[in-house]
């Protein structure tokens, strides 16, 4: 069976260090599908076309360049496909968004009410496939770093911006999307607490927090694994405003946050009896600018680059440092 993943509204990047590519590649691996990066007419030959909305999609469409002829042509290609499945999101929102743009200077003139009616008829029957619907051997649950710390055989229950503090307050057992907690479970929390919160408060008992983390995790599964927090990059690295908290990209100096990171890893390792998923130790001790250059996503980002994900053995052949 021929399976393909694509996005008619925006190209799926080809750059190896792209967060968006990493997200699409994980879906491709899980589904045993290929990626059509530019939504070519070749997708008509696939038995199933999966629509990837992008790692940062939250339910609303951002078409900064308008609905140009390329997007119009790509969507017309969808009309010729055998079967279409939308990944994670209800695709029917496209129609209302397009109707609002009819007649705009940035909208292709063939995007009309009649064309939108045809599109609506197509989209209303497209099913949604979510991570929790997959048949996989394990689950990685946590913040946006779950992409980097998930195993090849895992579903990913990702909650961007999630903190360990917030997860414990909610209850780890309540983070599994009302599905059975089965298989190998990896929890991925703590990086955002270190980046933004722990140094703001002088009364945080880190050991007590981690003990509660492990306690709640063991209430979910007998043998949980815990992702280490990510290394702390150099302070001058530019970050997107979406990663800011109270107007800043982090709180505390690089050296202070590294100290907290080292303490977190040490306590987590001891209290979990070594059940920790961690990149190579030298990442944490090397020059933070070289770490960012070699192992993080290209440009402004807080994430590990896809070639260095856990599923890729954390880059078993790392770049020259």
Give residue spans per PLM region:
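Charged phosphate-binding loop/patch that engages nucleotide di/tri-phosphates or the phosphate backbone
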Residues: 118-132, 305-320
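Serine-esterase "nucleophile elbow" of acetyl-processing enzymes
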Residues: 2-38, 101-182
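Alpha-helical cap/lid subdomain in secreted, periplasmic
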Residues: 43-113, 117, 128-134, 176-306
């Amino acid at each position: 069976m021929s399976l393909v993943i694509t996005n008619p509204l925006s190209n799926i990047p080809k750059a190896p260090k792209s967060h968006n590519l990493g997200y699409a590649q994980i879906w491709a691996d899980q589904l045993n599908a290929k990626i059509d990066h530019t939504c070519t007419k070749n997708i008509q030959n696939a038995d199933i076309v999966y629509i990837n909305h992008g790692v940062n999609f939250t339910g609303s469409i951002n078409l900064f360049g308008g609905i140009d002829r390329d997007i119009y042509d790509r969507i017309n290609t969808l009309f010729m496909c055998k079967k279409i499945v939308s990944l994670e999101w209800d695709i029917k929102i496209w129609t209302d968004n397009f109707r609002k743009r009819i007649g705009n200077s940035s909208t292709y003139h063939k995007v009309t009410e009649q064309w939108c009616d045809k599109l609506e008829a197509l989209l209303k029957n497209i099913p949604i496939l979510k991570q929790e619907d997959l048949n996989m051997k394990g689950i990685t649950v946590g913040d946006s770093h779950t992409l980097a710390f998930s195993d090849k055989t895992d579903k990913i229950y990702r909650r961007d911006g999630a903190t360990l503090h917030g997860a414990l307050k909610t209850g780890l057992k309540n983070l599994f999307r009302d599905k059975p907690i089965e298989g190998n479970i990896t929890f991925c929390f703590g990086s955002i607490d270190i980046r933004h919160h722990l140094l703001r408060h002088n009364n945080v008992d880190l050991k007590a927090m981690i003990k509660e983390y492990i306690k709640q995790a063991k209430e979910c599964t007998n043998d949980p694994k815990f992702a280490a927090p990510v290394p702390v990059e150099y302070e001058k690295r530019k970050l997107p405003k979406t990663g800011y908290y109270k107007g800043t990209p982090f709180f505390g100096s690089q050296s202070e946050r590294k100290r907290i990171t080292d303490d977190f890893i040490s306590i987590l390792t001891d209290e979990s009896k070594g059940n920790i998923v961690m990149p190579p130790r030298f990442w944490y001790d090397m020059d933070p600018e070289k770490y960012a250059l070699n192992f993080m996503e290209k440009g402004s980002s807080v994430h590990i680059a896809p070639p260095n994900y856990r599923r890729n053995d954390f880059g078993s052949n790392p770049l020259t440092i």
